[in-house]
Amino acid sequence: MPIGVPKVPFQIPGEEDASWVDVYNRLYRERLLFLGQEVDSDISNQLIGLMVYLSIEDDTKEIYLFINSPGGWVIPGVAIYDTMQFVRPEVHTICMGLAASMGSFLLVGGEITKRLAFPHARVMIHQPASYFFGAQTGEFILEAEELLKLRETLTRVYVQRTGKPLWVISEDMERDVFMSAKDAQAYGIVDLVAVE
């Protein structure tokens, strides 16, 4: 039996009665954002809009981005990352469950010293992939060139934000590299592991 998105009571300051809002809208009001799906243009635009709005509303209060994502599209993910770097409030990133592929890229993009993983979380990095199978040869070559540029961008960010040498990141991105929360901390993707 699907229950949909749960609703919770919320009382607007100055109002007599509470109104029922979905749990995510209630949490957004507390500056708690969630990426609990594959990264695509829709979720990217929603998160970007929320971060910009929250930054305008109060640029001194921190934002928390909870991540449980198998990854997703590179360009929408990079747009979220760029917004995290652009907004004035510090963005904490918290991995719960899985931060794979673009999810791990967003995790490492949090404010350095404020990136956290839950104790049983998993993190995975790898290189960007393309699904451009039915293309003409010329289009395929252009796609491959674009993929190499994107890989270079992602690699540069991982190097900058983890402190790992370029050759280590490049080598590790050749395949799927899964890490425990402690491994991700040692790698520099997160700064802290929550205690059990």
Swiss-Prot record:
Cleaves peptides in various proteins in a process that requires ATP hydrolysis. Has a chymotrypsin-like activity. Plays a major role in the degradation of misfolded proteins. It is found in: Plastid. Pfam families: CLP_protease (PF00574). This is ATP-dependent Clp protease proteolytic subunit. It comes from Epifagus virginiana. Its EC number is 3.4.21.92. Belongs to the peptidase S14 family. Disulfide bonds: none annotated. The gene is clpP. GO terms for molecular function: ATP-dependent peptidase activity; ATPase binding; serine-type endopeptidase activity. One of its GO terms (biological process) is protein quality control for misfolded or incompletely synthesized proteins. The active site is at S101 (nucleophile), H126. It catalyses: Hydrolysis of proteins to small peptides in the presence of ATP and magnesium. alpha-casein is the usual test substrate. In the absence of ATP, only oligopeptides shorter than five residues are hydrolyzed (such as succinyl-Leu-Tyr-|-NHMec, and Leu-Tyr-Leu-|-Tyr-Trp, in which cleavage of the -Tyr-|-Leu- and -Tyr-|-Trp bonds also occurs). It is an enzyme of class 3 (hydrolase). Keywords: Hydrolase, Plastid, Protease, Serine protease. GO terms for cellular component: endopeptidase Clp complex; plastid stroma. PANTHER family: ATP-DEPENDENT CLP PROTEASE PROTEOLYTIC SUBUNIT, CHLOROPLASTIC ATP-DEPENDENT CLP PROTEASE PROTEOLYTIC SUBUNIT 1. Component of the chloroplastic Clp protease core complex. Its main location: plastid.
